[in-house]
Amino acid sequence: MTKDLYDKLMVFGNDREPFLAHNFMRTTDLDDGTATVTLPMHTESLNRWGGAHGGILFSLCDVAMGMAIMTLRQEMVVTVNATIDYLSAAAAGSTLTTVGKVDRLGGK
């Protein structure tokens, strides 16, 4: 990936997407086919039991996937289908880190 593309994607992933800012998500690293996105757990991200809300976890993964794809295909992408298995809870005060990795880049 060129430095220009890296810089553009970092701006997009941190400064130009209102949903990410609203939910405290930050793109922290990009490489060809990978993207690292972090989420410091705030009260607004928790469910009524004090764990991370499933929707915010799914969104974190979705953002990492989309950013990883954009390192390889310089166009906007959308998720058509996704599945997630929740293995354990994340608590307030923790920071979650997810790495999206492209295994296979499909066609258009």
How should each PLM-predicted stretch be described?
Residues 1-108:
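Terminal targeting signals and extreme-terminal segments of soluble enzymes
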